[in-house]
Regions:
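C-terminal and inter-domain tail/linker signature
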Residues: 1-131
Length: 131
């Protein structure tokens, strides 16, 4: 996790690596003072490994692609200053997404595919850290 525009961009790249047709459909936008709230639906297809990282930026886990689609509700809160976002919070339906994508309950075969995906992600992460 980082800060600033580059971190925002890297988050978008990270998500699109796992969900190549990722979409956000805004249903409501509310502004009050320095806060802007957006309620939306996020949807896409799980087409690549979804890799998560620990607090030390090491690969924590990887969900192997399922080729399944999902659509979940989420709300984003932004604190604005001088026309720029200075803080961001999000509430997402991660459980609903995991169920729709077949991550839970996992089958033994899917657990094996996730283990292989995690090893591949760790290898790629080590290689990118060397270069």
């Amino acid at each position: 996790r980082g800060r600033g525009p580059e971190a925002f961009w890297q988050s978008a790249v990270w998500l699109r690596t796992a969900f190549d047709d990722l979409r956000h459909e805004a249903h409501a936008v509310v502004a009050a003072g320095d806060i802007v709230v957006i309620h939306a639906t996020m949807s896409g297809t799980h087409s690549g490994p979804f890799v998560t990282y620990d607090e030390n930026a090491r690969v924590k886990q990887a969900f192997a692609p399922t080729r399944r689609s999902f659509a979940v509700s989420h709300t984003h809160w932004y604190r604005m200053s001088g026309g720029l976002c200075i803080e961001h919070w999000a509430n997402r339906d991660d459980l609903g997404m995991a169920e729709q994508l077949g991550w839970i309950p996992p089958t033994p075969a899917y657990l094996w595919r996730c283990r292989r995906a995690r090893r591949a992600a760790q290898t790629a992460h080590r290689a990118s850290s060397i270069n």
